Amino acid sequence: MKLYSWNVNGLRACMNKGFADFLAAANPDVICLQETKMQREQATFDFPGYEEYWNSAEKKGYSGTAIFTKQAPLNVTYDIGIEEHDKEGRVITAEYPDFFLVTVYTPNSQRELARLDYRMVWEEVFLAYLQKLDAIKPVVVCGDLNVAAEEIDLKNPKTNRMNAGFTDQEREKFRIFKAAGFVDTFRYLHPEEVKYSWWSYMFKAREKNAGWRIDYFMVSERIKDKVKSAEIHNDVFGSDHCPVSVELEL
């Protein structure tokens, strides 16, 4: 089963930059999107062969997630069931026979860490949500987690030490996430590889490959050996992020 995840930074904008051609060429069984930045009723496009599940933020043009899947899930739920965390369209869970697929757009801690306190609360409640699912069947979590886990995961770790996405607090929450039994598939299969999934639009960052790896596929520890590949598709344009993927044999 071939799964892709991509923060498209606005699906309508990405459609104008080749999203449909990318989808046809990659031909994933499932693709999860973050930062769709639209309501489903605004879509003037559809994707034949895929069932579509959308979770949009209450605030128009902000956040939002979607799952497009060839195989109809057994069940689909939206958000995590806690009202204060369920207004921004950040989570969709699709249940398949052998696993839960959860796509997430983790809240950004923002400039001057204005939202870091909220982010810390989010990390705890989201992990608790995943652990409940994991008690039922294995979990595959994908999306923009808004954290570079280690120094290898960003071009300039020293100068970004106190910036959103690389604070000690965010990295500690990621360590706790892994310690709870979730495996970073790319790092598991590529322990030393330097590859990024996001580049600022400023300073010609992508041209210089001054990026961050903040988009992930995480899996329950007990299915890590079912992951046959984990890739970062940094040759695909259309957003400030690039797609990431895994192939699972379940």
Located regions from the model:
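Structured beta-strand-rich core segments of catalytic domains in phosphoester-bond hydrolases
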Residues: 37, 43-109
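Conserved beta strand-loop-helix elements of the APE1-like EEP
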Residues: 60-75, 193, 205-225
